Design a protein with these regions (language model features):
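A short acidic-Thr-Gly-centered motif at the start of a beta-strand
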Residues: 14-26, 191
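Hydrophobic (often cysteine-bearing) scaffold residues that line and stabilize catalytic clefts
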Residues: 5, 36, 56, 60, ...
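Short hydrophobic beta-strand that contains or immediately precedes a catalytic carboxylate
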Residues: 27-31
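Single conserved hydrophobic/aromatic residue that forms the stacking wall/gate
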Residues: 1-13
Length: 191
């Protein structure tokens, strides 16, 4: 899972073109398309999102269509961009304030969009609540392969500290599961 050459461990994309490889090796760049969104859709059993992925839809355009209530073909670039920000922001616990600071939306518009998002993908809200409750009861969460992330501050009386742990309760299993999948793929490529 790592290079045997220290300097190549953190190879930047722009530097790959300047690396010479012998005939027995290749440099490979691979990416799982929207892996974190696919993972949260699966873990949450969010059927609307799963169906969009299974139908080969662009998830950001599909989300924009749902939250703005317009046909996919009429989605503007700005609306798709806002939906993309919401899609990824949900994983990181974005608030109306956070969304408004990342987009041209007002805080009120951001709240309306986040509410519409959860109406479009109701399984996600349920999943998020279950993750936080599980962490509060057990003090940890797990990735799909059982790696644990302990959250010692999940029951903190300090709302700021507790809020950070609650966001970790949602995103750590998703990011950790993505890492699990990618590392397994790296091992399998090497076989």
């Amino acid at each position: 899972l790592h290079s045997s050459h220290r300097r190549q461990r953190q190879m930047c994309i722009r530097d790959r073109a300047f690396r010479a490889v012998d005939n027995n090796h290749v440099i490979l760049a691979a990416d799982y398309s929207q892996i974190e969104l696919r993972i949260i859709a699966s873990l949450a059993n969010e059927l609307n999102m799963i169906n969009a992925f299974n139908n080969g839809e662009d998830i950001h355009s599909s989300t924009a269509s749902k939250i703005f209530g317009i046909a996919v073909e009429k989605i503007s670039k700005e609306q798709r961009s806002q939906a993309k920000t919401v899609n990824f922001g949900i994983i990181y616990g974005v608030s109306a304030f956070g969304l408004s600071s990342q987009t041209s939306l007002t805080r009120k518009e951001s709240k309306i969009i986040i509410d519409a998002y959860y109406e479009s993908y109701p399984g996600l809200k349920n999943f998020i609540n279950k993750q936080i409750n599980f962490a509060r009861e057990n003090g940890y969460l797990e990735t799909i392969l059982g790696r644990r992330r302990y959250l010692r501050d999940i029951n903190s009386r300090n709302s700021i500290v507790r809020g950070a742990s609650e966001r970790n309760a949602v995103n750590a299993p998703i990011q950790g599961s993505a890492a699990d999948i990618i590392k397994l793929a790296m091992i399998n490529i090497n076989k």
